[in-house]
């Protein structure tokens, strides 16, 4: 960018983009982490603020209950979200959804239907497989990624007799299927970094939007007034057509014709009503053409002089008069300005809003270590020297005549098992 042209510092977003799409980044001495939100909910909150500028954050949260991630999942901790919306900082847990399925053979299957935001599915699957190999998660027989265009689906087939809820807790505890997301709502406000709460985000958006809509309205007003000014000139020339033709035919050059048209005072009987719709100056039945109007008259095509062409000019002037009146109303009234912003937001919501994907719940996340251990029958052995050992029954089997069993326990020298107990 060589600064030879003007470059916009911001884009005229019609909805709170920063909240809807979220943002994350690190700069020198500062960082930001803003989660994405549901478009429809953010617009509802913005409309509520337009209706009541003194609305509290707790009331805004009736419209915006929390972040909404494109990957779905479940947010845990409503109080943490409330803290983030009030102070701009906080950290909440988000977990993927795992459902249970029972197969025809009676075995259980866990299905991961959604994963936390910014978690890589392939990395997650590899991590689960690694934990199975390391026997940190027991009871998993097979893992398959069955995801397609319709959504995420990772099938985890369990071994017979394994408790699905225990495996589910192990997955939450040891993998990224349950992750943390940090609130740090730092944004650039008026050129300076500032940590904003939920209401401040929406207030800053409305302030920005008011400025954009006001500039746009003024631009449209100038454009409409310029067009109406030219049409009035054409209307005056049509009313005085014979005189206009006489001046043009009697001029040696186009410049002479231009000067003569500019210096002539024109009668406006039929055009007076048209003039009064657009211009407020007192004409007293006479009208002076401007340079722009004269240039438009000299470039006028003959087909505009037909009855149809004259009628088109009158119709367009009336439409422009109504448009100019409504634009001036918006510029002079903040209430009308906010009404325009409100209508734009409603149109966007109707066209693009989608249902919420992320659920929000309250839950206790401090897992008891016993909840992550599979329930199974174990063998307790007591030795002569007082050693006690716990082992799985899978390590032993009943030995039949002439058969060979498994070594269930080994003992030290001169020690032996004196008692066994299956529990």
Question: Residues of each region from the PLM?
Answer:
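Conserved mixed alpha/beta core segments that line enzyme active sites in large multi-domain catalysts
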Residues: 1-15, 409-410
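Flexible glycine/proline-rich, aromatic-decorated loop/lid segments
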Residues: 18
């Amino acid at each position: 960018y060589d600064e030879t042209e003007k470059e916009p510092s911001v884009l005229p977003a019609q909805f709170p983009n920063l909240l809807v799409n979220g943002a994350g980044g690190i700069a020198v001495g500062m960082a930001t982490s803003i989660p994405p939100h549901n478009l429809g909910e953010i617009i509802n909150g913005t409309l509520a603020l337009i209706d009541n500028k003194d609305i509290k954050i707790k009331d805004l949260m009736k419209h915006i209950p929390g972040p909404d991630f494109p990957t779905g999942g479940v947010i845990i901790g409503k109080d943490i979200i409330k803290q983030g919306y009030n102070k701009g900082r906080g950290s909440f847990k988000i977990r993927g959804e795992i459902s249970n399925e029972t197969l025809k053979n009676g075995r259980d299957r866990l299905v991961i239907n959604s994963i936390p935001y910014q978690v890589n599915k392939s990395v997650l699957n590899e991590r689960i497989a690694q934990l199975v190999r390391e026997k940190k998660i027991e009871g998993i027989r097979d893992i398959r990624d069955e995801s397609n265009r319709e959504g995420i689906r990772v099938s985890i087939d369990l071994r017979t007799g394994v408790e699905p809820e225990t495996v589910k807790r192990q997955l939450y505890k040891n993998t990224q299927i349950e992750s943390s997301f940090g609130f740090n709502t730092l944004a650039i406000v008026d050129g300076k970094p500032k940590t904003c709460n939920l209401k401040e985000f929406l207030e800053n958006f409305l302030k920005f939007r008011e400025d954009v809509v006001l500039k746009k309205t003024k631009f449209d007003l100038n454009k409409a007034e310029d067009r109406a000014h030219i049409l009035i000139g054409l209307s005056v020339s049509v009313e005085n057509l014979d005189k206009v033709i006489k001046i043009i035919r009697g001029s040696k050059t186009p410049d002479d014709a231009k000067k003569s048209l500019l210096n002539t005072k024109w009668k406006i009987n039929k055009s007076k009503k048209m003039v009064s719709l657009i211009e407020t100056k007192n004409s007293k039945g006479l009208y002076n053409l401007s340079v722009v109007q004269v240039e438009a008259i000299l470039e006028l095509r003959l087909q505009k002089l037909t009855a149809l062409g004259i009628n088109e000019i009158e119709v367009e002037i009336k439409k422009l008069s109504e448009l100019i009146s409504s634009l001036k109303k918006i510029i002079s009234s903040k209430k009308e300005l906010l009404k325009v912003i409100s209508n734009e937001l409603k149109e966007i919501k109707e066209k693009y809003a989608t249902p919420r994907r992320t659920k929000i719940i309250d839950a206790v996340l401090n897992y008891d270590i016993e909840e992550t251990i599979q329930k199974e029958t174990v063998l307790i052995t007591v030795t002569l020297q007082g050693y006690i050992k716990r082992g799985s029954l899978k390590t032993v089997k009943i030995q039949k005549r002439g058969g060979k069993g498994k070594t269930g326990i080994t003992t030290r020298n001169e020690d032996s098992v004196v008692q066994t107990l299956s529990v």
